[in-house]
């Protein structure tokens, strides 16, 4: 009977030590999740610069040839939608890291 009591006390002590370590580790994990979310959003900078460059070139093309406005606009919208997907994925990863991680 005494061995069972000692075992249960040792088990409770081990559980308390593990829970204290887990509490300290979870704060570090949250900090790394925020850091990862920030790093994931760095990828959006390139997307914004690329879309701005493409829009500028589309304006130049329309200024040179106004009759091709519909074709240039269609290509611009498709290109913008394709390039925007990477920033949406970066935002999704950041939100998952912040709220789930």
UniProtKB/Swiss-Prot annotation:
In terms of InterPro entries, this protein maps to: ATP_synth_csu_bac/chlpt, ATP_synth_F0_csu, ATP_synth_F0_csu_DDCD_BS, ATPase_proteolipid_c-like_dom, F/V-ATP_Csub_sf
Q: Which residues cross the membrane?
A: 31-51, 81-101
Subcellular location per the Swiss-Prot or TrEMBL entry = Cell membrane
Q: Which Pfam families match?
A: ATP-synt_C
Name the membrane topology term: Multi-pass membrane protein
- The residue range of the signal peptide is none
Site feature location: Reversibly protonated during proton transport: 84
One molecular function GO term is: lipid binding
Domain of life of the source: Bacteria
Q: Which GO CC terms are listed, alphabetically? A: plasma membrane; proton-transporting ATP synthase complex; proton-transporting two-sector ATPase complex, proton-transporting domain
Keywords on this record?
ATP synthesis, Cell membrane, CF(0), Hydrogen ion transport, Ion transport, Lipid-binding, Membrane, Transmembrane, Transmembrane helix, Transport
Its chief place of residence is: membrane
What HAMAP family does its record include? Answer: ATP_synth_c_bact
Quaternary structure, from the entry: F-type ATPases have 2 components, F(1) - the catalytic core - and F(0) - the membrane proton channel. F(1) has five subunits: alpha(3), beta(3), gamma(1), delta(1), epsilon(1). F(0) has three main subunits: a(1), b(2) and c(10-14). The alpha and beta chains form an alternating ring which encloses part of the gamma chain. F(1) is attached to F(0) by a central stalk formed by the gamma and epsilon chains, while a peripheral stalk is formed by the delta and b chains.
Q: What does this protein do?
A: F(1)F(0) ATP synthase produces ATP from ADP in the presence of a proton or sodium gradient. F-type ATPases consist of two structural domains, F(1) containing the extramembraneous catalytic core and F(0) containing the membrane proton channel, linked together by a central stalk and a peripheral stalk. During catalysis, ATP synthesis in the catalytic domain of F(1) is coupled via a rotary mechanism of the central stalk subunits to proton translocation. Key component of the F(0) channel; it plays a direct role in translocation across the membrane. A homomeric c-ring of between 10-14 subunits forms the central stalk rotor element with the F(1) delta and epsilon subunits.
Q: Which NCBIfam families match?
A: ATP_synt_c, PRK07159.1
Q: Which PANTHER family match?
A: ATP SYNTHASE LIPID-BINDING PROTEIN, MITOCHONDRIAL, ATPASE PROTEIN 9
- Quote the protein name from its UniProt record: ATP synthase subunit c
User: Which gene does this sequence derive from?
Assistant: atpE
């Amino acid at each position: 009977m005494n061995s069972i009591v000692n075992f249960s006390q040792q088990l409770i002590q081990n559980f308390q030590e593990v829970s204290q370590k887990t509490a300290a580790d979870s704060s570090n994990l949250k900090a790394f999740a925020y850091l990862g979310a920030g790093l994931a959003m760095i990828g959006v900078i390139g997307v914004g610069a690329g879309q701005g460059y493409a829009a500028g070139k589309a304006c130049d093309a329309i200024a040179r040839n106004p009759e091709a406005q519909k074709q240039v606009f269609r290509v611009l919208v498709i290109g913008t939608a394709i390039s925007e997907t990477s920033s949406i994925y970066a935002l999704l990863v950041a939100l998952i890291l912040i709220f789930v991680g």
